[in-house]
Curated annotation (Swiss-Prot):
Residue intervals annotated with topology Cytoplasmic: 53-62, 124-144, 222-244, 311-377
GO MF annotation: an example: G protein-coupled receptor activity
Species of provenance: Rattus norvegicus
Composition bias type Low complexity, residue spans: 335-349
Protein name: Apelin receptor
GO biological process, one term: regulation of gene expression
Major location (coarse): membrane
PROSITE patterns xrefs: G_PROTEIN_RECEP_F1_1, G_PROTEIN_RECEP_F1_2
């Protein structure tokens, strides 16, 4: 990334400060990266398996965003072993210039794609719950596919500067090869900071601030609609009301907690070129930035749990799918069992009961508008 925590050395604006004593954890950070890699590949792989395992007829527009989000996170986490090695070797890149460019590019493409997919999913939930009739045509599967394609193209274009400017080099008085952003092809040594600040601030605006505002707005109106609806319901609806509202809060808060420290510290550090922070504060930013990066990366392995397993219907769908694979339920994977597993993506379908794999009939719940709408409709 142009400002992703792997370019810790050689910043022009901090050259007057002494960082001789600064060393990030050579064991903790790689361990976190590997843990995120393991959880992310498993979780996102399970999400993709479940989505594509369901029957095509039962899929909804949100399934496209869910699958795309899982692909984005999966592609992101598979690059983490490279960065874990880089960090463990005390920022010595052994994989060559091309892999430096490509892995950095993939990280940024999928960071943007992941954020955009979350935003698209939030907007899809807004249409499904707040404006289900007036915007029905916008929620067709073909519209979701087109929107997802546009989001991926936009993410790929926004990440182009990383592919262009990423390079490897051995700094003076060092024997370690760094994978860093090199602006020398377009700027002088005195103006490279302007490129760094410009690209860094723009990536924060496009990759965090604007999407977060959109998500927050969508979930505000969703919560308002759900709360207004359940005021008319009896006591049995309170539990579902509390569950739906808690999911909304968890989604928004988790996204903010994972990404806000990274973007905040990154922006403050880069603004040191203009504001000339004291060396103590600048050293503090440099020390905490690698750990803020780790926290943001953790979001890629949390998404499957938050957007899938946190939803009881999706959890039952996974259980039904695995149980049917082992004991053999009636119907093919793309018929009865698949229709049950797809219930997480249908806002008005009946969820399978806990005894589904034992041959019993599904337990039907009372149909309550909106209470059957999930965040992964």
């Amino acid at each position: 990334m142009e400002d992703d925590g792997y370019n810790y050395y050689g910043a022009d604006n901090q050259s007057e400060c002494d960082y001789a004593d600064w060393t990030p954890s050579g064991a903790l950070i790689p361990a976190i990266y590997i843990l995120v890699f393991l959880l992310g590949t498993t979780g996102n792989g399970l999400v993709l398996w479940t989505v594509f395992w369901s029957s095509r007829e039962k899929r909804r527009s949100a399934d496209i965003f869910i699958a795309s989000l899982a692909v984005a996170d999966l592609t992101f986490v598979v690059t983490l072993p490279l960065w874990a090695t880089y960090t463990y070797r005390e920022f010595d890149w052994p994989f060559g210039t091309f892999s430096c460019k490509l892995s950095s590019y993939l990280i940024f493409v999928n960071m943007y794609a992941s954020v955009f997919c979350l935003t698209g999913l939030s907007f899809d939930r807004y249409l499904a719950i707040v404006r289900p009739v007036a915007n029905a045509r916008l929620r067709l599967r073909v519209s979701g596919a087109v929107a997802t394609a546009v989001l991926w193209v936009l993410a790929a274009l926004l990440a182009v500067p990383v592919m262009v400017f990423r390079s490897t080099d051995i700094p003076e008085n060092s024997t370690k090869t760094q994978c860093y952003m090199d602006y020398s092809m377009v700027a002088t040594s005195n103006s490279e900071w302007a490129w760094e600040v410009g690209l860094g601030v723009s990536s924060t605006a496009v990759g965090f601030v604007v999407p977060f505002i959109i998500m927050l707005t969508c979930y505000f109106f969703i919560a308002q609609t759900i709360a207004g609806h359940f005021r008319k319901e009896r006591i049995e609806g309170l539990r579902k009301r509390r569950r739906l509202l808690s999911i909304i809060v968890v989604l928004v808060v988790t996204f903010a907690l994972c990404w806000m420290p990274y973007h905040l510290v990154k922006t403050l550090y880069m603004l040191g070129n203009l504001l000339h922070w004291p060396c103590d504060f600048d050293s503090f930013l440099m020390n905490v930035f690698p750990y803020c990066t780790c926290i943001s990366y953790v979001n890629s392995c949390l998404n499957p749990f938050l957007y899938a397993f946190f939803d009881p219907r999706f959890r039952r769908a996974c259980t039904s799918m695995l149980c049917c694979d082992q004991s053999g339920c009636k119907g093919s994977p793309h018929s009865s069992s698949a229709e049950k597993s797809a219930s997480y993506s249908s806002g008005h379908s009946q969820g399978p009961g806990p005894n589904m794999c034992k041959g019993g009939e599904p337990m039907h719940e009372k149909s309550i508008p909106y209470s059957q709408e999930t965040l992964v409709d």
